[in-house]
Amino acid sequence: MTGESGSAAPSIALNDENTMPVLGLGVAELSDDETERAVSAALEVGCRLIDTAAAYGNEAAVGRAIAASGIPRAELFVTTKLATSDQGFKGAMDACEASLERLGLDYVDLYLIHWPAPALGTYVNSFGGMIQSRGNGHARSIGVSNFTEEYLTTVIDLTFVTPAVNQIELHPLLNQEALRKTNAEHNVVTQSYTPLALGKLNDHPTVNSVAAEYGKTASQVLLRWNLQLSNAVIFRSANAEHIASDFDVFDFELAAEHMDAINALNDGTRLRPDPDTYEGS
């Protein structure tokens, strides 16, 4: 990871020679108004990665906040995702163009397949379409989300292109050790979502004990733990104060004993849908 602390997140190298901030704001389940306010607040404190999706229905709101910020496009990293209903070779290309129109952008920095939806059997063809989107300049990097080892290796084997990122549910209750290892073996960056476990660990004695030791919030400790696993991380909040606090995690480092204590919370609890059975969004 490279970069400086404080005003901006460090960046991580992707396998396609692009770089991506290690920490960014996600806007899942936020209304248009909440999205605009959250994105504006995040940009204000130096966050430069904004993660949205066609299925969230708020790409236009993200675009408005970006436009209003006046921040040069080259300084931003914008991710969107292919909705399951648009999967397919041509569908993936057309959906990327539709997302760009809603965002008011000429390209996205990262375009992901939102869910594998294996029952559909179209995720490989979809990735083929995304390769075309990258080739025509609509997406700088392409990747996947919620892909297990099976789906990830299938895409690589059948398209001969390795996704830059695999964005997955990852928090201390579901630390995804095996999948992180698989991603790393393929030089795929693991990007975590739901890193705060939907607040379920805010009052956990282990997390609170570690937080007290560093004078940090539970959320800051959970984000720091995730970052120190060499993951990129997407957090979500509609609260400007929480966004500022959650982004302020580059001035401390958890000791090995505290990393181990948080790792020990892993019990396989999944808070989001199971990629093997979920029909996608």
From Swiss-Prot:
Protein name, UniProt field: Aldo-keto reductase MAP_3007
UniProt KW keywords: NADP, Oxidoreductase
The keyword rRNA processing is annotated on this UniProt entry: no
Pfam families: Aldo_ket_red (PF00248)
PANTHER family: 2,5-DIKETO-D-GLUCONIC ACID REDUCTASE (PTHR43827), NADP-DEPENDENT OXIDOREDUCTASE DOMAIN-CONTAINING PROTEIN (PTHR43827:SF3)
Taxonomic lineage: Bacteria, Bacillati, Actinomycetota, Actinomycetes, Mycobacteriales
Enzyme superclass (EC): oxidoreductase
Family statement: Belongs to the aldo/keto reductase family.
Single GO MF annotation: aldo-keto reductase (NADPH) activity
The keyword Zinc appears for this protein: no
Residues in coiled coil: none
Binding site for NADPH: L196, I234, R236, S237, A238, S245, R272
Active site: Y56 (proton donor)
EC number: 1.1.1.-
